[in-house]
Amino acid sequence: MTYVVGVTGGIGSGKSAATAEFEKLGITVIDADIVSRQVVMPGTPCLRAIAEHFGRDLLTDKGELDRKALRQKVFSDPAEKDWLNSLLHPAIREEILTQLEQASSPYVILSAPLLLENNLDKYCQRVLVVDVPEELQLQRTIQRDESPKEEVEAIMKAQLSRKARLRKADDILNNESSIDQLRRQVNQLHQRYLAATVAQEE
């Protein structure tokens, strides 16, 4: 059985920087955000269902999903959002499980902003939370995405609170300092996870 480490953290916490360091160590990273884009690529059953349900004006000239238009369509309509989630969540889950089965590194990172909210942690042996104070989350996200403060705060509210996330963590990676500090922590965790995979196989 593949040893899976679930990585999560609030918006702006630096999940991508952390998982990139694991990748440099030869570890397979399955990113739920990337999977969510893969399941709606041209030719997929999900994209066909979305076009039938919402109309073809949600497709670009190239036949790709206009994600911004879709977000606007479902943002203020809970029923449509539920319909979309009931279509996408099972497809994303299935694709994640397929990629987990195909992974060949000693252990696998499953990175998902909503790992805990969407119960993806049930596929993981460990949960690693990338953590920064909420003020820093806000500051980093506004700088990175050039988003209005209110929009970032709304996203943060929709996610688990920092306190609730930390309660569910097996491991915590503090990311309020430098990239060197992040790298050191990743290296330590990497050794721990390698040891855990060996123990699991014995």
Curated annotation (Swiss-Prot):
It is found in: Cytoplasm. The keyword Magnesium does not apply. Its EC number is 2.7.1.24. GO terms for molecular function: ATP binding; dephospho-CoA kinase activity. It is an enzyme of class 2 (transferase). PROSITE patterns: DPCK (PS51219). Keywords: ATP-binding, Coenzyme A biosynthesis, Cytoplasm, Kinase, Nucleotide-binding, Transferase. It catalyses: 3'-dephospho-CoA + ATP = ADP + CoA + H(+). It holds the Pfam family CoaE. Residues 4-200 form the DPCK domain. ATP binds at G12, S13, G14, K15, S16, A17. GO terms for biological process: coenzyme A biosynthetic process. GO terms for cellular component: cytoplasm. Gene3D superfamilies: P-loop containing nucleotide triphosphate hydrolases (3.40.50.300). Pathway: Cofactor biosynthesis; coenzyme A biosynthesis; CoA from (R)-pantothenate: step 5/5. PANTHER family: BIFUNCTIONAL COENZYME A SYNTHASE-RELATED (PTHR10695:SF46), DEPHOSPHO-COA KINASE-RELATED (PTHR10695). NCBIfam families: dephospho-CoA kinase. Belongs to the CoaE family. Catalyzes the phosphorylation of the 3'-hydroxyl group of dephosphocoenzyme A to form coenzyme A. This is Dephospho-CoA kinase.
